[in-house]
Amino acid sequence: KRIELINTEKLLIDILISNSDRLRNVKLGEGELNFIINSKIPDLRIELTDFSTCFNLNSLVKPFRNIYVKNDLHGELFKTFLKVNEIDSNKHREFLDLLYDSLDSDSLPESFGAEDLFYVANDNLSLSPDQLYIHKSQIKNLSFLSDNELLQIYPNICALPNTDLFFNINGLNENNYLVLLSISPDLSINDIEKII
């Protein structure tokens, strides 16, 4: 049974590599993989998730020598993301500074941010990791946005293990178009509607 699973895993990897062009559309790729695999293992169901249609929180910093420093360009795009998600504009700068401080490697607080020593004085103790996020839920540790505001952005944020910010246009839909709108400021809602 174990050898069969290993062979199936190898088959899956080979299929993914040889069909990578056709699998750019996640749902299409998921269907094709399930069709191919179900002929060999009928009980196996494959689900693919495209993480290139969300705003990568880790893109708010960039590598510089051996540390991470804030990425001002992506910070401006994140403020646009907050704006199109109708988050109170008075919170944008402070929230962004808190994110920078939790992700960057230095010990210097941003204007509205806080590093570890500043968090200790807070009733809701929350030490910043000073490293890339492992999971998007770490944004909750900042205890800054209301639950409703967090729910507005949560489906469209992610924490990928890199500092890249990109969007897979093949995955564009009515649930994630605000991400594309925020990272491509030259596009209008009308442009995006035409693409969808």
Protein language model annotation of sequence segments:
Residues K1-I196:
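Compositionally biased linear targeting/interaction segments
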